[in-house]
């Protein structure tokens, strides 16, 4: 069963900013742009304005996700990905970007696409304190305990934490 689109009220804080839109049919994220030009040196971060604020219906939240092309081509990431926009928030949506490229600066021009906004229905939960949780196949395994990465699977000289062994990816990359 396909639901229709969710109606979201939007306020344009910059009269020239485009309303967030989807690049292709079926896309999950609507593109957000920056309203200010900025240049980030390697390792530098900035909070970029999008020129929009929204009012989500109760039971929904929006999540600010990175754009894969910026990550792949420029080394740009979002510091708090995904950023959460709660239904009651009415301020401007801003995006915290960081330039992870070790050598090159990255420049953003006004109205460059910098992130994607994904709107999702969210559930409210009630937490019930218990002395013990029921068992599961996974138990307390986390942080790579299911494998699937060469640096974690059978890593020699790795770090052991809670019975799990981890490779020091940072040390490996820095040649230490």
Swiss-Prot record:
According to UniProt, the reaction catalysed is: dUTP + H2O = dUMP + diphosphate + H(+)
| EC numbers, comma separated | 3.6.1.23
| Residues where substrate binds | 67-69, 80, 84-86, 94
Q: What InterPro entries does its record include?
A: dUTPase, dUTPase-like, dUTPase-like_sf, dUTPase_trimeric
Q: Which GO terms describe its molecular function?
A: dUTP diphosphatase activity; magnesium ion binding
Give the top-level enzyme category: hydrolase
Instruction: Tell me a GO biological process for this protein.
Output: dUMP biosynthetic process
Question: Where are the annotated segments for Disordered?
Answer: 141-176
What keywords are assigned to this protein?
Hydrolase, Magnesium, Metal-binding, Nucleotide metabolism
Q: Which Gene3D superfamilies match?
A: 2.70.40.10
Q: What protein does this entry describe?
A: Deoxyuridine 5'-triphosphate nucleotidohydrolase
Specify the species: Streptomyces griseus subsp. griseus (strain JCM 4626 / CBS 651.72 / NBRC 13350 / KCC S-0626 / ISP 5235)
